[in-house]
Amino acid sequence: EIIVGYVSILTDSMKLKILEDEETKKEICNELNISENNELPAIKIGRFAIDKKYAKQGLGSHILANVLLSMLKLSKTKIGFRVIIVEAYAIALDFYIKNNFYTRESDKEILKKIDMIKKQDPTRCFNIYLDLKDIKEEPKN
C-alpha cells in the first residue's frame, strides 16, 4: 500500500461572532438561545497533506470532500458541531478557499498581500472555517 496523504481531525470550538454570514449567525443564536460571544462547537482539521508526487492532480480536493462528507454524517449522529475550522498555511489558503472555506473578516486587509506572504512566510497561519450547511451531500469524483 502507498500512503498518498493524511488528515487529522480533532474537536475544538470557535467564537460564533467570527461567522461572516449574519443570517446564519442569527439562526444559530436563536436556535441555541446564545449570544454571538459564545463558543460554537467545531471540528478542526489539524493536519492535511498530500505527498508531493501526487500534488496538483485533484486528489487533495477529492480527499477533503470525502472527509467533509464524513464530518457531516458525524454531526448528525455522533458529535454536535456546526463548523469545521482550519489553521491554514498561507501556501494552502487558495486550496481551502477553492473548497468553500471562509476567511475571517479581520484578515481581509492582510489577505490582499497574500502573494507576498506566501513568498516571505509560507507557513503563516490563517484561521478559516466552513459551515456544515455549505457541504454538498455527495463527494467530488
Question: Regions from the language model: what does each represent?
Answer:
Residues 1-5:
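Glycine-rich acetyl-CoA-binding "A-motif" of GNAT/NAT acetyltransferases
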Residues 46-56:
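A short, internal acetyl-CoA/4′-phosphopantetheine-binding micro-motif in the GNAT/acyltransferase core
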Residues 56-71:
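Conserved acetyl-CoA-binding loop-helix of GNAT-fold acetyltransferases
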Residues 75-77, 81, 86-113:
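Conserved active-site alpha-helix within GNAT-family acetyltransferase domains
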Residues 87-91, 109-141:
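C-terminal "cap" of GNAT-fold acetyltransferases
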